[in-house]
Each structure stands twice: as C-alpha cells, then as structure tokens.
Amino acid sequence: MRIILASSSPRRRQLMELLGIEFEVEKPDVEEEFLESPEETVRELSLRKAEWVFKKRKEEEILVIGSDTVVVLDGNILGKPESLEEAKGMLKKLSGEWHVVYTGVAFVSSETKDVIVSSTKVRFRELPESVIDYYVEKYRPLDKAGAYGIQDFAAVFVEKIEGDFFTVVGFPLGMVWQYLYEKGWWKFASKREDDKGGARVAFG
C-alpha cells in the first residue's frame, strides 16, 4: 500500500520522514472554514483533505493522511492570518495568555476512514511589540495557525506547555505512529547487510 500525505506543509513532511517510511506528498484543494467547535473543525478539515486526494487517486491502493490545526484563544478560533498585520494582531492577543492548539489527523483508504484529534495548552510570555514585529517581518507566518511556529524562533514565546509538543507543530507524531502501528501498517522489516546496523520499515 502506498502512503500519501495530503498536505503542503513542509513541517508535516519533515515529521512524516521521522517515521522512516516511504510516502508521497500531494496538496489538497480544500477551502478552510471554521465549524461550531475547534474539535469539529480540525476533524472535518483533516478528513476533507484526505478524502480530496483519495478521490482523485481512487483507482490506486493507497492510504491518505490529512491534517489540520487551529489555535483557540478565549473560545475564539484563530486560523492562518491573511496578512502580516493580522498576524501581528493575533500574536498581540496571544501575548501573556493561555491558548489551546487542536490538531486533527485523518486516515482514508478503501477500508478506512478514521480521525484522531489532539489538543495541547500553551502559555505565551508577555511579548514586546518590537519582538512581534521582528518575528512577523522575518518569518512571515501566514501559513501557520495562530501566526506562529513553535519549531522556529517563536519557541522563545512559550512559557509553559501542557500536552503534546508535536500537536502544536501541527502533526502529533506519536499518535500517528501508534495508529499506524496498531493497524498493522507500520512494522520492522528484516535487516539487510547494507543497512549498516539499521532497520528498514515496511508497510503491511
């Protein structure tokens, strides 16, 4: 079975590579919208992304993985900013506050349609406006929910975190691996002489 990551995110691609499996990447054409709750939003959007790619390539034996992330502050969903000014506004709101990051991951194949959702609480330090301006101008976080990437300079914004770090990055790696492992889609293959002590990973 071939694995396809339905995402344009370089961060999700990098995290998938840590699983040691072969996979392809295809960007889904899905309009993002906020639903009644953050859980429902990431659940539905991750599923739409995976289904879009699956339907496009439905003649193939594939497993498609889609993911979506939102940030929630005081009950309000923050998605990706549409401008640098909006990004600065989001970070000003997050400054010194707790917020919750929700990430959904969908798995779609001819026999599977499952979604897992993970949430993590994050508290930011008080951020000087000059630091916010520096970050937004240098990193231009228009592709990131909440206008920040915890894996880049914005890591210094974080005062406390409660939950899974990779949920905040946008791909809860441990949960993804556990799902694939329990379904029998991730397993060690036999070692080869040219592995130099390592192990290959195969999908069942």
From Swiss-Prot:
Which cofactor is essential here? a divalent metal cation
The record's GO CC annotations read: cytoplasm
Q: What is its EC number?
A: 3.6.1.9
The residues annotated as site (Important for substrate specificity) are R11, T69, Q151
Subcellular localization(s) per the UniProt record: Cytoplasm
Q: Which reaction does it catalyse?
A: dTTP + H2O = dTMP + diphosphate + H(+); UTP + H2O = UMP + diphosphate + H(+)
Short name of one Pfam family for this protein? Maf
Extract the SUPFAM superfamilies matched here.
ITPase-like (SSF52972)
Biological-process GO terms, alphabetical? nucleotide metabolic process
Q: Provide the active-site residues from the annotation.
A: D68
| Keyword tags | Cytoplasm, Hydrolase, Nucleotide metabolism
Q: Which GO terms describe its molecular function?
A: dTTP diphosphatase activity; UTP diphosphatase activity
**InterPro entries associated with the record:** ITPase-like_fam, Maf-like
- NCBIfam families, from UniProt? maf (TIGR00172), PRK14363.1 (NF010943)
Indicate the family of this protein: Belongs to the Maf family. YhdE subfamily.
PANTHER family named in the record: BIFUNCTIONAL DTTP/UTP PYROPHOSPHATASE/METHYLTRANSFERASE PROTEIN-RELATED, BIFUNCTIONAL DTTP_UTP PYROPHOSPHATASE_METHYLTRANSFERASE PROTEIN-RELATED
Question: Its biological function?
Answer: Nucleoside triphosphate pyrophosphatase that hydrolyzes dTTP and UTP. May have a dual role in cell division arrest and in preventing the incorporation of modified nucleotides into cellular nucleic acids.
The name this protein carries in UniProt is: dTTP/UTP pyrophosphatase
Q: Taxonomic lineage per UniProt?
A: Bacteria, Thermotogati, Thermotogota, Thermotogae, Thermotogales
